[in-house]
Curated annotation (Swiss-Prot):
Belongs to the ABC transporter superfamily. Energy-coupling factor EcfA family. Keywords: ATP-binding, Cell membrane, Membrane, Nucleotide-binding, Translocase, Transport. Forms a stable energy-coupling factor (ECF) transporter complex composed of 2 membrane-embedded substrate-binding proteins (S component), 2 ATP-binding proteins (A component) and 2 transmembrane proteins (T component). This is Energy-coupling factor transporter ATP-binding protein EcfA1.
Length: 279
């Protein structure tokens, strides 16, 4: 049986006592080594949930357990040792004068010796394809390059869990593809548990499992293919449909009957080729 690396039980968070809760009675588990996507429209509460997992926002009710440690004010730093987090805007995360200084920052905070720090920084930059930018100022980089540097900083400290909080939302399509490809590779190499907070349904397709948050509540949980088959239900919650589902809808409008189950881009391409060859 797969071990749960995170357990969230009846979590509620309220920014102000005069406001409705941003999260209400949310419970779920995260399996060690899995990729979990948490999707929802803007303002649904998904980023509040992400920040609650490592104590950035102290929840009002409920409990969070990470790696067997229950999150409390006394244990928050033990929990954070296990988690690396990348946010939407990489500029808000940079503290170093150069790329390599920034990647080294987390190691310096952990009082890692320079003899150990230098090779770890070099290895982290190599893993994200940023070795040649080590001496550059972070401000001179593109958005995609900045997120790679932020990811290198996480790789260097070697956490068990990586949280991407809308980390690809400010990237162009190619930058998004490249970033997710690097995350997939790192996950395999380091047995990372990945939690992706996103409103991008195509990004959620990379996950093993998807949670849907709507108005602060967990309203659905399933594998991506089952979630994407919800169709109009996703649209009603302010989410987009995956490209392949849009394509299937367009085919139906033209009198063509596509597969009824969710198809990845590769599967849809194969189906189209077979359909064309049979006509």
């Amino acid at each position: 049986m797969t071990e749960n690396i995170i357990s969230v039980d009846h979590l509620t968070y309220q920014y102000d006592e005069n406001q409705a809760p941003a999260l209400t009675d949310v419970s779920f588990t995260v399996h060690a080594g899995e990729w979990l996507a948490i999707v929802g429209h803007n303002g649904s509460g998904k980023s509040t949930l992400a920040k609650s997992l490592d104590g950035l926002l102290p929840f009002t009710q409920g409990s969070v357990t990470v790696g067997g440690i229950t999150l409390t004010p006394e244990t928050v730093w033990q929990v954070r040792e296990q988690i690396g987090m990348i946010f939407q805007n990489p500029d808000n995360q940079f503290v170093g004068a150069t790329v390599e200084d920034d990647v080294a920052f987390g190691l310096e905070n952990r009082q890692i010796s320079r003899d150990e720090m230098v090779p770890r920084v070099q290895a982290a930059l190599a893993q994200v394809g940023m070795t040649s930018f080590a001496q550059r100022e972070p401000s001179s980089l593109s958005g995609g390059q900045k997120q790679r540097v932020a990811l290198a900083g996480i790789v260097a400290i070697a956490p068990k869990i990586l949280i991407l909080d809308e980390a690809t939302s400010m990237l162009d399509p190619q930058g998004r593809i490249e970033m997710l490809a690097i995350v997939r590779q790192l996950r395999q190499q380091q047995n990372l548990t990945v939690i992706s907070i996103t409103h991008d349904i195509d990004e959620a397709a990379s996950a093993d499992r998807v949670l849907v948050i709507d108005d602060g509540r967990l309203v659905d949980e399933a594998v991506p293919s089952q979630i994407f088959e919800r169709g109009t239900q996703l649209v009603e919650m302010g989410l987009d449909l995956p490209f392949t589902e849009k394509l299937k809808a367009a085919l139906r409008q033209r009198g063509i009957t596509p597969p009824t189950t969710y198809q990845t881009a590769a599967e849809m391409e194969e189906w189209l080729w077979q359909s064309l060859s049979n006509t």
